[in-house]
């Protein structure tokens, strides 16, 4: 395919036009008085949203050079969303400001490499100052406040704080569509996995068709149990304790299953058998998780253990186990807390090392099950369009809340970025590096400027007063008042603000140092066939 190539100012100008189109579309959503954007969908009803990354992903421009600029900024929003889960609108406004100011200087003859170094130095100083002025987030009320700001709903804030309190900061919180109109919270405490009882005759509650084991022993193995003689010595030992037994195995079949069922029906022995969760290496890891949680040992050839030689020492224990036809929940495992903490640390390091989103998601699930449970926020709404929009907002709020707990919070509404201007301005730089620093100083004002503009106020006036105010005091664009931002609940997670600034500076610097752009030349359309002469149609 033939290529179209542009150089220097032509190349940068074309990309900047794309940056402007995307950023101008997204920035209308910024702040409490931000508007919505309607996105056409190929199928179904249009999507109405104010989520920056969702809008950015939908924008596709006809001009290839402009589209490249737009896609680079879209990448900033996506990257910020991946790292922090929120702040995507700010992440599109900032690169536009840096590119716009930088392009003026590059066009005037400044060295783009020097400017880039200045931008990087200034952003590093800004990030350090953000961390200095950050306040830690702890307690249910503070978490609810962060979530309420991001979702624009106090009720959603309460649900998220309740969920995080119940399942822990590392717990899995999923967002699903409700069948009703109300949004509700459902929490499954303990370790749950998707494997039910192997026989319905193992239930203890015939009405609910569940088996509930109080204070059971737990046998964990990756072997298939077909011969009851393999586990008979162990069963006799458990029988002496008069406590129930949960068997987690690759499978239980042959004579073993009917023998266990028969003893259960006769009341000799309360036992439930389930298949091991997962497959392959993931199954081994999950069985090890269960063993650590319950204080047991996986009976496996990898450790040189055999079922017929197993003793009571390999059995795990828990306060309660509930098994239905589809799932098993282990509550309050008797495992050593330091061993569990060590296992959690290992899984976290694996999450950081993996490049696969699927693997990261599965590791997160394992982490949650070890940490305490799973919470489900079921989103309800009157229409499908409202439901989609609400779901996006809650996802953003959940991510922002996790980010806030991780790195703390700063004043919201762009105030924190203005608060760090003094520290950045104090940097002693020369020449083009100083120009790069000044570009960042101007860009740090941009979110406040746009929030004020969307609310009908003059941005320059707001920024001038903000620079003279104490750190923490800011402008509430919702009602036009000057308030203590944190006390009022107008807050941003440091991780969100930091990620948006760092990613924006990175991509903007790349655009400013671009000297050539290569795009695919559109192929000429094939000529359409001429219409047939009616006289040649045989009189039809």
From Swiss-Prot:
Subcellular location: Cytoplasm
Xref: InterPro entries: Chaperonin_Cpn60_CS, Cpn60/GroEL, Cpn60/GroEL/TCP-1, GroEL-like_apical_dom_sf, GROEL-like_equatorial_sf, TCP-1-like_intermed_sf
GO molecular function (one): ATP binding
Keyword Cell membrane: no
The UniProt record lists the keyword Nucleotide-binding: yes
Sorted UniProt keywords: ATP-binding, Chaperone, Cytoplasm, Isomerase, Nucleotide-binding
Catalysed reactions listed for this entry: ATP + H2O + a folded polypeptide = ADP + phosphate + an unfolded polypeptide
Pfam families membership: Cpn60_TCP1
A Gene Ontology term for the protein's cellular component: cytoplasm
Record: residues binding ATP: 29-32, 86-90, 413, 476-478, 492
EC number: 5.6.1.7
Family matches, as SUPFAM superfamilies: GroEL apical domain-like, GroEL equatorial domain-like, GroEL-intermediate domain like
GO process annotations (BP): protein refolding
Entry's family note: Belongs to the chaperonin (HSP60) family.
UniProt subunit comment: Forms a cylinder of 14 subunits composed of two heptameric rings stacked back-to-back. Interacts with the co-chaperonin GroES.
HAMAP family attached to this UniProt entry: CH60 (MF_00600)
Classification via PANTHER family: 60 KDA HEAT SHOCK PROTEIN, MITOCHONDRIAL
Function: Together with its co-chaperonin GroES, plays an essential role in assisting protein folding. The GroEL-GroES system forms a nano-cage that allows encapsulation of the non-native substrate proteins and provides a physical environment optimized to promote and accelerate protein folding.
Protein name stated in the entry: Chaperonin GroEL
Organism, as annotated: Streptococcus agalactiae
Gene encoding the protein: groEL
């Amino acid at each position: 395919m033939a290529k179209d190539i542009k150089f220097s100012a032509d190349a940068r100008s074309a990309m900047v036009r794309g940056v402007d189109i995307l950023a101008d579309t997204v920035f209308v959503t910024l702040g409490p008085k931000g508007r919505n954007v309607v996105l056409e969908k190929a199928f179904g009803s249009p999507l109405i949203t104010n989520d920056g990354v969702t809008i950015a992903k939908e924008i596709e421009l006809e001009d290839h050079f402009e589209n490249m600029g737009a896609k680079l900024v879209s990448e900033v929003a996506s990257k910020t969303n991946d790292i922090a889960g929120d702040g995507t609108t700010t992440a599109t406004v900032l690169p536009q400001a840096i590119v716009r100011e930088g392009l003026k200087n590059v066009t005037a003859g400044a060295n783009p490499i020097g400017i880039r170094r200045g931008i990087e130095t200034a952003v590093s100083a800004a990030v350090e100052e953000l961390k200095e002025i950050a306040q830690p987030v702890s307690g249910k009320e503070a978490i609810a406040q962060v979530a309420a700001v991001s979702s624009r709903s106090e009720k959603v804030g309460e649900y998220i704080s309740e969920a995080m309190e119940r399942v822990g900061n590392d717990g899995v919180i999923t967002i699903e569509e409700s069948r009703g109109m109300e949004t509700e919270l459902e929490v499954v405490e303990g370790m749950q996995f998707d494997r039910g009882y192997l026989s319905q005759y193992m239930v203890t509650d015939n009405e609910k068709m569940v088996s509930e084991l109080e204070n059971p022993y737990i046998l964990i193995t990756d072997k298939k149990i077909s011969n009851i003689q393999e586990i008979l010595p162990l069963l006799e030992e458990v029988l002496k304790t008069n406590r129930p037994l949960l068997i987690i195995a690759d499978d239980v079949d042959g004579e073993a299953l009917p023998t266990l069922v028969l003893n259960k029906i006769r009341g000799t022995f309360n036992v439930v058998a389930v298949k091991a969760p997962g497959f392959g290496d993931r199954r081994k890891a999950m069985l090890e998780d269960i063993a650590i949680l319950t204080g047991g040992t996986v009976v496996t050839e990898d450790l040189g253990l055999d079922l017929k030689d197993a003793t009571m020492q390999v059995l795990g224990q828990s306060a309660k186990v509930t098994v239905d036809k589809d799932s098993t929940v282990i509550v309050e495992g008797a495992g050593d807390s330091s061993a569990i903490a060590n296992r959690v640390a290992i899984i976290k390091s694996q999450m950081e090392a993996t490049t696969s989103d699927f693997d990261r998601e599965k590791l997160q699930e394992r982490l949650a099950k070890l940490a305490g449970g799973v919470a489900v926020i079921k989103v309800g709404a009157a229409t499908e369009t409202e439901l989609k929009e609400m779901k996006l907002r809650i996802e953003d709020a959940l991510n922002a809340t996790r980010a806030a707990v991780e790195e703390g919070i700063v004043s919201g509404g762009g105030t924190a970025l203005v608060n760090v201007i003094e520290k950045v301005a104090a940097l002693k730089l020369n020449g083009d590096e100083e120009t790069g620093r000044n570009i960042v100083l101007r860009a740090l004002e941009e979110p406040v400027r746009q929030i004020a503009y969307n609310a009908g106020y003059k941005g320059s006036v707001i920024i001038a007063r903000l620079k003279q105010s104490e750190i923490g005091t800011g402008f509430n664009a919702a009602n036009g008042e000057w308030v203590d931002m944190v006390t009022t609940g107008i807050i941003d997670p440091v991780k969100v603000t930091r990620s948006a600034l760092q990613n924006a500076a990175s991509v903007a610097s790349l655009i400013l140092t671009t000297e050539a752009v290569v795009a695919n030349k559109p192929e000429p359309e094939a000529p359409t066939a001429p219409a047939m002469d009616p006289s040649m149609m045989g009189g039809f």
